[in-house]
Amino acid sequence: MATERQYSPIDRLLLQADSAMRTLLPSSAHSRRPSPAIVQPDHKMSDVDTRHVAGLMRINHTGEVCAQALYQGQALTAKLPKVRKAMEHAAEEEIDHLVWCEQRIHQLGSHTSVLNPLFYGLSFGIGAVAGVISDRVSLGFVAATEDQVCKHLGEHLEQLPIEDGKSRAILEQMLSDEEHHAESALEAGGFRFPAPVKFGMGVLAKVMTKSTYRI
């Protein structure tokens, strides 16, 4: 029976640096699953709608950048190997979302947010601190974060033009995946955050969405 490879602290730091580069450098990440948008027809949208959808997808892309950083930070400081492995697996699944959003943004003739490095650093730090506190808090933070993401995705789905089937297919699959991540984190023993904490997280999320919609 094969044994799981043990990484030294230096190995883990190098892996984190590699993950950060693949997350932040344009077109450097690769998805495991094809984009749900591939099978959808490409309908013409007005310039106003195109810019609006690009802004929404830019928000979602930055959200995935934050998710990558959060999971990687938690994986670095998680105490139990099974929790660390779960964080690393979740980060791999989020790569698909990252790539899909980036591809759609480029199809719409726009760009990803210049603020991504800032939000990556902040999210990585939050994830690392949560992991240091306890694995239960770390998992609970995942569940609470995914709840926020699901809320944003639902709002964005309502705002999409009816003819934009490509963006809709991407966001619907992302919503399904994120709901599963939240449920899995709680089932693994995650702490259910109280309403005031979730409210504070929501305020921070609004800062991200407002700032990345245009830049």
Swiss-Prot record:
Pfam families: COQ7
Name of the featured protein: 3-demethoxyubiquinol 3-hydroxylase
Keyword Hydrolase assigned: no
Gene: coq7
EC number: 1.14.99.60
Cofactor: Fe cation
GO biological process per UniProt: ubiquinone biosynthetic process
Pathway the protein acts in: Cofactor biosynthesis; ubiquinone biosynthesis
Binding-site residues, Fe cation 2: E94, E146, E178, H181
Region annotation (Disordered) ranges: 25-44
Membrane topology: Peripheral membrane protein
Family note: Belongs to the COQ7 family.
Cellular component GO terms held in the UniProt record: plasma membrane
KW NAD (keyword) present: no
